[in-house]
Amino acid sequence: MRRPSTLTVMRWELRKLRSQKRTYLGVGIAVIFPLIFVLAQNLNQHHHGGGADNIYLAHITESGLATPVLTLLFESAFLLPLMALLVAGDIVATEDGNGTLKTILTRSVDRGQVLAAKVGAAALYTIVGLFLSATVATVAGVASWGFNHVTTFSGTIVSAPRGLLLVIAAYGFFLIPLLSVMSIGVLLSTITRNSAAAVVGALGVTLVLALVTVIPGTSSIQPYLLTTEYNNWHGLLRTPTDWAPIWHSAWVCALYAVPSLIAAYLVFLRRDVAGG
């Protein structure tokens, strides 16, 4: 019997994701928040003449391109990691717990292929969810405040087309720490056989890392904490572009993602699924 390709196995995984409620819950969280944000700012503008008294919202009405940047600032700490983990934490645990992994492994598919397909499906879901959030935020912002020039974090005014490219780049770069969080979720999903434990556990890890940053005396390790990397995309929105935090974040995130995926593979390789 011919062994199916990893891409074929990944298509199986994507079909399963389409039938699961948590798939749509995660995307819904990522998409609804920008709409609520834009609605709130429109109401604020209508009743109070805008948000000039707020450091984050002072320029929001100047250009709709400020909206996806501001929503990324707010969503990056919790909502977007939660979106990624709702699937990553479930991707192995549910089938393992239900005893259906052994059915997949009897289709002449080796374990490495199965895990690679699951990681690929979780990664694709994370990418699609993130850019759906970006698209909704951009469209809603532009519809409310126009496709105008935008002010960078350095105070430099850039044209609307360049501003749009910077927004895309910012979201693209945020994928690096987000995929690292996803990798931790896959690892815990593989270890625990319990979706809730994997999701809560991975969120707990990120929460602990975030809390470490506010503990006095931890400044020397803060540059190496995953949650610190959530904000390093800010360097793309400065003039000139500050590449130092970008490259630093890339290799720091790799230190979290690569060992997590290797450990997940080793655990999955040795997992006894014969009894369910």
Can you describe what each PLM-predicted range is?
Residues R2-R3, L7, L237-G276:
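Alpha-helical transmembrane segments of multi-pass membrane transporters/translocases
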Residues T8, T218-R238:
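Short hydrophobic, aromatic-rich alpha-helical segments embedded in or entering the lipid bilayer
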Residues L85-L105, R111, V119, V273:
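Transmembrane helix boundary and interhelical loop/hinge segments in multi-pass membrane proteins
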